[in-house]
């Protein structure tokens, strides 16, 4: 408790480092964050001409570090598995592609509360986020810490954290295919989940225009999920 109070004092009295912010996030919810999560995800893709396409996914997470996405209908065998900082893409229950991938939204939205602080820091450094660059700003009327960029810089890869709740709310980064564009990912509509929090909507914008929206329903936390759901060798295993 004393250590947590000292850390809060540092955050309040002086500009924190990115390490301070990560440690504060971890310590605030130590032993309180849910270990599993499942939900139905309603997707809306918006094309540049304004037309939309809708889809449904089912997702299961075992935290830290494991996420299973099943494209509906589940028996299609299509989906994606994230585990051990790797991405497995499945088509008709067969692995089509495997690649190394640190999922930044998993790290910042979930794993940060359960992984050791040093592991989170190491993963963020591998994602090329400058943890020494920190400033304060306001987002949706609430004060936030911005880690990874200087004031006024909305191009460099950076993440935003609600200063009071210590939850991740925003990620900005150059586009992966076109680095002249800016990707803006927002965790919206936070709601209590026991003693923790859950964002029930995630928006993906490109240069200020929404291109993908995820809305979560049938949300369940700390439900028992079998290990087979997250084993790429046993992808056909499905949860009901």
What does each model-identified segment do?
Residues 14-96, 128, 132:
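N-terminal mature ectodomain segment of secretory-pathway/periplasmic proteins
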Residues 55-56, 65, 76-78, 133, ...:
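Residue-level marker for the onset of beta-strands and adjacent loop->beta junctions
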Residues 14-23, 33, 86-155, 175-181, ...:
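Flexible, processing/modification-adjacent segments and terminal tails
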Residues 63-69, 89-91, 109-112, 169, ...:
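Short, surface-exposed linear segments at secondary-structure transitions and domain or protein termini
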Residues 5-6, 43, 160:
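Compositionally biased, intrinsically disordered low-complexity segments enriched
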Residues 2-12:
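Sec-dependent N-terminal signal peptides
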Residues 59-63, 84-87, 104-107, 162-164, ...:
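A short, sequence-level motif marking secondary-structure junctions
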Residues 139-236:
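Gly/Pro-enriched, hydrophobic low-complexity segments
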